[in-house]
């Protein structure tokens, strides 16, 4: 391992200690919390959209998020280990078969939606068994009206 790769690995480990990013992939809808500085004030702004690409590896890894804002498509590239990213929340998983979803740029409206991935194996389904109460036999006297 050369010195540059070693320094990058140390920086990745240092940033990973501060915040834990979820394991998301292309097609997932994510909410990225970005620290924005306006003048002297700093605030955290949420940017929610579909992850359409991941590129690079190690310290140079990036991901691209696309959202529709007021009818216009907006894409933003985030460095994975940027100190300006406060965190990433996974909103929903998407079912895609491509590594890059650049074809979404040409689609409009409902055609640009991505189907949700449903993983039935990981879902904890608890079957609640009804406890059958012991049947109580009531002694009912039958009378006949004459």
UniProtKB/Swiss-Prot annotation:
One BP annotation, GO: translation
GO terms, molecular function: structural constituent of ribosome
Family annotation (PROSITE patterns): RIBOSOMAL_L19
InterPro entries reported in the protein's UniProt record: Ribosomal_bL19 (IPR001857), Ribosomal_bL19_CS (IPR018257), Ribosomal_bL19_sf (IPR038657), Translation_prot_SH3-like_sf (IPR008991)
Keywords recorded for this protein, A-Z: Ribonucleoprotein, Ribosomal protein
Cellular component GO terms held in the UniProt record: cytosolic large ribosomal subunit
Entry protein name: Large ribosomal subunit protein bL19
């Amino acid at each position: 391992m050369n010195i540059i790769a070693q320094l990058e690995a140390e920086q990745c480990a240092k940033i990973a200690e501060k915040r834990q990013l979820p394991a998301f992939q292309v097609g997932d809808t994510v909410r990225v919390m970005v620290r924005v500085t306006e003048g002297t004030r700093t605030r955290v702004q949420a940017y929610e959209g579909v992850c359409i690409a991941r590129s690079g590896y190690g310290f140079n890894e990036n991901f691209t998020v696309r959202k529709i804002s007021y009818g216009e498509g907006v894409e933003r590239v985030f460095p994975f280990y940027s100190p300006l990213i406060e965190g990433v929340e996974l909103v929903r998983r998407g079912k895609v078969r491509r590594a890059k979803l650049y074809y979404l740029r040409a689609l409009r409206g409902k055609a640009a939606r991505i189907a949700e991935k449903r993983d039935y194996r990981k879902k904890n389904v608890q079957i609640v068994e009804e406890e059958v109460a012991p049947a109580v036999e009531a002694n009912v006297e039958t009378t006949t009206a004459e």
